[in-house]
């Protein structure tokens, strides 16, 4: 590619999916430019690496580019897209560019409705501990690396495979992981769950004859598609028929202790530096791949015990003073689907038994809130105290029956929790200061602008101190 394409421009370069690919391309020696609506830590990092960053979208930003990379979130009337089309500069989907990177190495693609980012991070960390020095592209910041992407010298590239827009069908990896299949982003599949499952089957058909599908048999929908997978399958999970499974699971001190049972191998005692059964499952996927690639048991154990997590995935911000002189524990999480939220809440209950759980939640997308409305009411009713904000639209038109006020009314009618509703995330720090008590565990959760709230709370605390 490099002899023809030297300058690559990214529209929306600050996004999690785009920035990782851009960083790898910078490190491969390409000239990279990009634009976004606002400056952030990601754009600053890319600029420091040598990328040319523009704030705001303008036709002039693509000057000299041989290719323009876009995601499905970029509108067709974006001025940079229009300029590229007028100048006959190829417009490349993000997943297609990721597929080009995978052609340079052997790809390990992590798919599934939930758990992709954490599983990708665990796989990359375990392979790195085993000396394989993988390249990785992750949808969140791997805390140990300080970035969501890295160019390694090894043979493998580990990346998330996105089913939300069916773009994972552009990838041709040698190993695939399917963590679970759940009803999300159903607009892509015509609100037909059978079509979504068929897309995952087609994803496995991208594997070469020597490839393998590493699948979680605890998920009933994944289990249903196994008979239709024509390539070798490795089953992992907590189920008795899993080839890589966890037994004797014990949650202690925010960590998961368990024994891994693998066919033809001695039992392996593991301490995972993450809470929650869902993270045990995610770790099993990494263990299955690492075992197949010859990573030593010692390296597997070390990587999982020392795993520092991923930004916005049960990320701990430490203890914060309360108004009455006590302290509460602050955690931030990206969960935005009821299934993810339930798993995180369960993990918090296990990590902090007996403590009051306060949730600050910003729903993400009106369509998701509408489609999962009853499930949101059920999962939000399981916390001890709730602060709710208006829905983060993500470009969607508002739906009056699926906005924050409608969700608040439904929660009050359910009668299990009395939500405190605030219109904006800017009001969250003050609202939480009134709600939080000594000894509480406070979780800020959502995929939108709520991600900036924990740092704001910490900053406010430091200024007062």
UniProtKB/Swiss-Prot annotation:
GO terms for cellular component: cytoplasm. The keyword Cytoplasm applies. GO terms for biological process: cell division; cell wall organization; peptidoglycan biosynthetic process; regulation of cell shape. Transmembrane segments: none annotated. Its main location: cytoplasm. Coiled coil: none annotated. This is UDP-N-acetylmuramate--L-alanine ligase.
